[in-house]
Amino acid sequence: MAKKKKMSKAESKHIEKILSMGCCVCVNLELGETPAVPHHISNNSMGMKSSNYEVIPLCPVHHTDGGYGVAVHQGRVQWEANFGTEQELLDQTMEWLNL
């Protein structure tokens, strides 16, 4: 198994900034800013995890706990049909951060 690479200070600061925005799906649904966890988007690079700069903020419900179509890890295709693609949400997140 590959050794985990330690996150740089810049990566850690970037993720903290993203998480401070709250869940991007909840914000889009006008549910307010709910506490978020980092979700690394799927970049289709042969199972490799995306970089720590390809992260969107999702609440636990929209990340893992919400069930099919509500949580990205419970059914990505339906989730993206409901809320937008991961890339669209990443682009929106970067726009919110003025990056």
Which positions does each model-derived feature cover?
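Extended interaction regions within the primary functional domain
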Residues: 2, 46-47, 60
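Histidine-centered catalytic micro-motifs
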Residues: 36-43, 59-65
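Conserved catalytic motifs of the protein kinase core domain
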Residues: 34, 54-55
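Short, intrinsically disordered, charge-biased short linear motifs at domain edges
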Residues: 7-15, 43-49
